[in-house]
């Protein structure tokens, strides 16, 4: 008979009743009926590096406040004998959980203590083995060890952030915020006295195809290069507590699901702990109040720390410096991952605030988009810390809005965004865009993001990731400085140049030359930021290069790399030889959005792709392509597969594909066609043969 210790050592036991075979402490005068009975299980005996171990505690006793009346302490011992402390949290009636993402390979052990306010205690032990997964996880984000403005992952690989955020709420009260999401809609039809719109196909009022769902949102943005998601409670979102003595269990659960969904689609998470909640910001001497703030900080770390990369204390709030002097060390003391910390309003001069996170809304003249971005970047970087602009977008005067347009969008918005983004990349800062896309006139500020904006981001991110983690700002000299501004990045092996024609965006720049010091023995690729076209390939020599610049109208980039020509869809054909750069099956010359694989047609030219356009031809009559008398945008199951696209659980992740409705791993391939649904590196067929779960990335055959 194998002992409990032996079973734990081999990982063959995944659950244990704490009452049996482990220590139990109870009051001396307690009856047998007062024994604290707890059962704990763990989600797997084998956890890939940086993936999440989850321990569940089943306990049926009733408590007045189960968030506070039960305390769970987990002491983990790493393979190198380091001890790490994490806490548990209340999940739902009868269930508590604890989470941990291991960052060291080998066998881990842990000791559990579960106690309540009645003086009862139960304790137990467990173990798991941390392995390197077949599909590697690069770890959490860290400040670059040599460049204070860049980030790298734990494994040392590069990270070039570009972020997005939006509103969330369970407005239909079905227990999820993911089944309803609003994407690119036209100008609204529900205004009582709508202003006249400018002429042109992009300025039309009509219905939208909303609601959609979060799978469509995260897939559309993730596959185009967005890789940072910012979320905070009470910030166009739900609250996580009624007050600091009463936490909300359902809202905690939907936050779990939201962060897990973002990570599934490749997003890293900037987590705002308090948002707009007032938390004794200007009462640093309120010991009782600050103790409650600390309690919620620890709850947040215990519950979400395994999914988060950056912590953000507040959103657009002022707090006394002494409040931060108390809270920063406390957050650092309870966070086993040492995630970088920021806040808003920004306080970059404070010790312990590791990211400068200003907010910036502007509708500048597009010819100055690079100039104003560069000026702000230089100012924000004076503190020697990474800069992630926590909110970025357009704006207009609320009292004097632009006639007929609103604040979130105009027909030059995508271009301004493109120029800002490229300039930000070359100044070592990043933006998080506040997305308000349910309507083009939905607000007086924020930004409307559609397929045009997404494909511009995809072009830039593909360029960025062909650089390396060590690129830093560099000097470039242009021959026509009264017409073109130039910016450069370079490392020992790679380099990039970005040129903006700021004189006008209508005539071509010709005869331009630039002087720049570059790594040699490689090729340079003149790259169009609008569509990734390779305009010219040149030989690069080590040292100063005097280069002839191909003619261009708005902007142009130069990529210097030894890795060969850019290939944005990784299909083996470089961009200048590839007739379908987004690999969506529609040739680029017939693709309205050749870099966005979610859209390819735009019949009315309104920059809303036909897949999400409720009126494809812009005639004011909603589409009814199946001719059943019901406008398509009102049909929840347009593809007829029996799964509605929104307002239900489960929802259809592929609402226009009758053969697909679920995407377990967020790779853009529906489970019915995907040979590895959970993306754990083990084909589904192999998992079924081995008896493991092909939909669970932590359940796979033992190698």
Locations of regions flagged by a protein language model:
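Extracellular glycoside hydrolase catalytic/binding regions
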Residues: 295, 315-455
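Active-site mouth of glycoside hydrolases
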Residues: 71, 117, 138-367, 372, ...
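Extended acidic/polar, glycine-enriched regions
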Residues: 75, 84-148
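Aromatic- and carboxylate-lined catalytic core of secreted/periplasmic carbohydrate-active enzymes
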Residues: 36-47, 62, 395-397, 405, ...
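Extracellular calcium-associated, cysteine-rich motifs in secreted modular proteins
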Residues: 564-703
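Bacterial N-terminal signal peptides
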Residues: 11-23
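Short strand-edge motifs at loop-to-beta-strand transitions and within beta-strands
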Residues: 53, 96-98, 545-547
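Non-catalytic, glycine-rich low-complexity segments
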Residues: 31-80, 86-88, 127-133, 142, ...
């Amino acid at each position: 008979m194998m002992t409990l210790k032996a079973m734990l050592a081999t990982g063959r036991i995944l659950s244990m009743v704490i009452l049996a075979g482990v220590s139990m402490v109870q009051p001396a005068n307690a009856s047998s009926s007062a024994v604290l009975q707890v059962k704990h299980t763990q989600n797997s005996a084998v956890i890939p590096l940086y993936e999440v171990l989850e321990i569940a505690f089943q306990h049926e006793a009733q408590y007045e406040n189960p968030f506070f009346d039960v305390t769970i302490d987990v002491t983990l011992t790493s393979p190198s004998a380091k001890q790490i402390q994490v806490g548990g949290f209340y999940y739902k009636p009868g269930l508590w959980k604890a989470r941990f993402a291991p960052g060291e390979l080998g066998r881990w052990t842990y000791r559990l203590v579960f106690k309540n306010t009645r003086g009862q205690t139960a304790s137990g032990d467990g173990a798991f083995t941390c392995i390197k997964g077949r599909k590697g996880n690069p770890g959490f984000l860290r400040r670059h060890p040599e460049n204070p403005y860049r980030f790298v992952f734990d494994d040392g690989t590069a990270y070039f952030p570009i972020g997005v955020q939006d509103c969330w709420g369970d407005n239909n009260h079905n227990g999820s915020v993911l089944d309803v999401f609003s994407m690119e809609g036209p100008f609204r039809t529900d205004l009582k006295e709508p202003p006249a719109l400018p002429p042109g196909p992009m300025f039309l009022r009509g219905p939208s195809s909303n609601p959609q769902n979060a799978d469509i949102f995260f897939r559309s943005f993730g596959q185009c290069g967005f890789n940072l998601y910012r979320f905070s409670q009470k910030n166009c979102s739900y609250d996580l507590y009624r007050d600091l003595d009463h936490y909300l269990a359902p809202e905690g659960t939907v936050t779990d699901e939201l962060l897990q969904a973002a990570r599934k689609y490749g997003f890293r998470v900037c987590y705002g702990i308090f948002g707009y909640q007032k938390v004794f910001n200007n009462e640093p001497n309120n010991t009782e109040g600050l103790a409650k703030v600390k309690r919620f900080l620890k709850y947040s770390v215990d519950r979400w720390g395994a999914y988060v990369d950056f912590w953000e204390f507040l959103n657009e709030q002022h707090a006394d410096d002494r409040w931060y002097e108390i809270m920063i060390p406390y957050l650092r003391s309870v966070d086993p991952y040492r995630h970088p910390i920021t806040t808003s309003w920004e306080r970059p001069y404070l010790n312990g605030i590791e990211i400068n996170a200003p907010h910036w809304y502007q509708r500048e003249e597009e010819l100055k988009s690079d100039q104003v971005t560069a000026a702000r970047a230089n100012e924000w970087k004076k503190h020697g810390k990474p800069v992630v602009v926590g909110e970025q977008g357009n704006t207009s005067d609320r009292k004097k809005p632009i006639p007929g347009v609103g604040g979130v969008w105009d027909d030059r918005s995508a271009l301004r965004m493109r120029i800002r983004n490229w300039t930000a990349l070359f100044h070592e800062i990043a933006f998080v865009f506040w997305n308000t896309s349910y309507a083009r006139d939905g607000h007086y500020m924020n930004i409307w993001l559609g397929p045009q904006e997404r494909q511009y981001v995809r072009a830039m991110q593909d360029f960025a990731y062909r650089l390396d983690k060590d690129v830093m700002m560099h000097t470039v000299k242009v021959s026509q400085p009264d017409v073109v501004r130039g910016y450069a990045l370079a490392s020992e092996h790679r380099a990039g140049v970005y040129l903006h024609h700021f004189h006008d965006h209508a005539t071509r720049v010709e005869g331009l030359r630039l002087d720049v010091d570059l790594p040699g023995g490689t090729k340079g690729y003149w790259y169009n930021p609008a569509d990734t076209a390779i305009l010219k390939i040149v030989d690069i020599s080590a040292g100063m290069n005097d280069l002839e610049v191909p003619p261009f109208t708005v902007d142009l980039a130069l990529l210097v790399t030894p890795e060969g020509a850019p290939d944005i869809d990784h299909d083996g054909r470089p961009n200048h030889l590839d007739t379908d750069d987004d690999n969506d099956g529609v040739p680029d010359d017939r693709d309205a959005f050749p870099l966005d694989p979610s859209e390819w047609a735009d019949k009315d030219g309104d920059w809303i792709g036909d897949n999400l356009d409720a009126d494809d031809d812009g005639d004011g009559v909603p589409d009814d392509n199946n001719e059943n008398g019901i406008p398509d945008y009102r049909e929840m199951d347009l593809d007829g597969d029996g799964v509605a696209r929104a307002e239900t659980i489960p929802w259809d992740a592929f609402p226009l594909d009758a053969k697909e409705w679920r995407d377990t791993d967020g790779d853009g391939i529906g489970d019915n066609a995907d040979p590895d649904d959970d993306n754990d590196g083990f084909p589904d067929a192999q998992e079924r043969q081995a008896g493991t779960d092909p939909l669970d990335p932590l359940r796979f055959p033992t190698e």
